[in-house]
Every structure is written in structure tokens, then in C-alpha cells.
């Protein structure tokens, strides 16, 4: 009886999250706690490649994005407004609608003759799902882990967050369990290695013009960072994605990644919020505290 009652309560909670009037996330949410954390940056290759592996998203990047030519500028331009959908409080829905507007003209036909549009509900939701999973992966590996209840809370919050975009809620799974099935299915059956994905794996960070350093030295400095991100991505990919990408991962690699994650977690205990948090997240916390 108690199990059935718990299931009914969970279903009501999730259904309410999907049908209720959009309410922005606040400072007590786990999404606020993790999404603006600097450690999410370590998963740049992971999230960028997973998004680009989705055929419609990859085609849009190949045809319309400057990501591959100017990665730093493109990431900065994208991350700042997306942070706002989480941290802007009463303006979060307006920020979400603005982001939706940015994508209205991204459409076309890919090399295989398939039509794509950035505002296709399935495509738009997949991008959002990768941000949700980014939070879970960062928290699990680099911030001390999550309980099952916290994962379910983050699932409900990701639904609440998604409502800020004013998109169709049709693709959004009803429960945490259904989301896990959705994620497994897309990773197993729908993702593909395309040009946009390969270029993320081989991405280089162009030297800014104001940096007074020879380009070859700059490139050598960034090589270990990009290689490290590829290694982290390999470890956090689902096995089906890792296999499709031709990446190798051993039990020893997993042990090393877990130890590295513990070291990162320990190091960040001494990092002040002014460094640890994205500026939009820091401003939101200060605003919530009346500062």
C-alpha cells in the first residue's frame, strides 16, 4: 500500500510540474546550487558533442553556428542567456522566450536530406536534457554525489526550468524513471557521429588577439586541457555513445576519474563564490539575499 501511495504521489508531483503555471526556480533549488558552478566547464566537450550528435542539432551547428570558428565567443554568447533562464527570477520566462527567438531562423535540410528546425520540440528538448544531465554528472563526479531523492528533485526542477521557454511539453518524460528510459533510448538509437561532433572532439581554442603570445605556444598550452576534457567526456558518456565514438574506457580509467573528482571536490572547498559561480548565478544569489 505504501509503495502504491508513493508512486501516486510522485506521479501527481510530476504531472503538476508539467501542467502548472510556470514558476521560476529559486535559491533553494538544487539547480541553482549546481548549474552556475565553475566545475560544469569541465564537461564542455561532453555536452557539446552530445548535443551535436543529435542529427538535427548537429546539422544546425554545421550550417548556422560560429562555434567551430570562434568557440569561446559562441559558448559565452550561449551560456549567459541560458544561465538567465535559471537565475533571472521573475524575468526568467522573458529570458527563455528570448532564447527561443534566437533559434527561430535556424532551419534547413541536412546532408542526408532530412529537414531540421531548432524549434522542433524533440530537438529543443534534447538540448535541454543535456543541460539537466550536465548537472547530474557534475554533482555526481565532482561535487560529492547525489541521493536518489535529489536526482528526482532535480528532474522535477528541470521540468519547471523547461517551462520557462514556452515550448511544447509533449517530449518531456512524466517521471524520473521515464526520463532514464528516454535518455538511454536516444543515446542508443538516435545519436550519430557527424562532422560537428568530430570537430568538437578536435576543437582548438583560437588565441585571442589581445594575448601577446606566439600562437604555437598558445596551442601547446591548451592541448592538455582539451585532451583532459575528451577523457572526461569518454568516462561520462553512456557506453553506447562511447562505443559509437570509438573511445576506450577501462576500469582503471574509471578509478582515476573518481579519484580526480574527489580531488576537485576537495580543492573547491577553498574556492570563494566570486570565483566558483558564474556571474549571473552570483548576482542572483546576492539579489535573493537583498544585497
PLM regions with names:
Residues 3-291:
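Mature, function-bearing regions of proteins
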Amino acid at each position: 500500500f505504501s509503495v502504491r501511495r508513493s508512486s501516486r504521489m510522485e506521479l501527481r508531483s510530476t504531472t503538476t510540474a508539467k501542467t502548472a503555471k510556470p514558476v521560476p526556480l529559486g535559491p533553494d533549488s538544487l539547480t541553482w546550487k549546481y548549474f552556475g558552478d565553475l566545475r560544469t566547464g569541465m564537461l564542455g566537450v561532453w555536452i557539446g558533442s552530445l548535443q551535436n550528435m543529435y542529427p538535427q542539432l548537429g546539422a544546425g551547428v554545421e550550417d548556422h553556428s560560429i562555434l567551430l570558428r570562434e568557440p569561446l565567443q559562441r559558448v559565452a554568447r550561449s551560456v549567459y542567456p541560458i544561465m538567465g533562464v535559471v537565475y533571472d527570477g521573475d524575468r526568467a520566462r522573458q529570458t527563455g522566450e528570448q532564447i527561443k527567438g534566437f533559434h527561430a531562423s535556424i532551419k534547413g535540410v541536412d546532408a542526408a536530406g532530412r529537414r531540421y528546425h531548432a524549434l522542433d520540440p524533440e530537438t529543443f528538448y534534447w538540448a535541454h536534457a543535456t543541460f539537466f544531465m550536465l548537472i547530474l554528472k557534475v554533482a555526481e563526479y565532482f561535487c560529492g554525489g547525489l541521493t536518489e531523492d535529489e536526482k528526482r528533485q532535480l528532474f522535477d526542477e528541470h521540468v519547471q526550468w523547461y517551462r520557462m521557454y514556452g515550448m511544447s511539453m509533449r517530449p518531456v518524460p512524466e517521471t524520473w524513471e521515464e526520463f532514464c528510459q528516454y535518455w538511454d533510448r536516444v543515446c542508443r538509437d538516435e545519436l550519430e557521429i557527424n562532422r560537428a561532433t568530430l570537430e568538437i572532439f578536435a576543437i582548438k581554442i583560437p588565441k585571442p588577439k589581445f594575448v601577446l603570445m606566439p600562437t604555437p605556444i598558445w596551442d601547446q598550452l591548451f592541448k592538455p586541457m582539451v585532451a583532459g576534457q575528451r577523457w572526461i567526456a569518454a568516462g561520462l558518456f553512456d557506453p553506447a555513445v562511447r562505443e559509437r565514438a570509438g573511445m576506450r574506457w577501462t576500469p582503471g580509467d574509471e578509478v582515476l576519474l573518481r579519484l580526480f573528482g574527489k580531488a576537485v571536490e576537495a580543492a573547491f572547498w577553498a574556492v570563494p563564490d566570486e570565483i566558483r559561480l558564474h556571474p549571473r548565478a552570483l548576482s542572483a544569489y546576492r539579489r535573493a539575499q537583498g544585497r
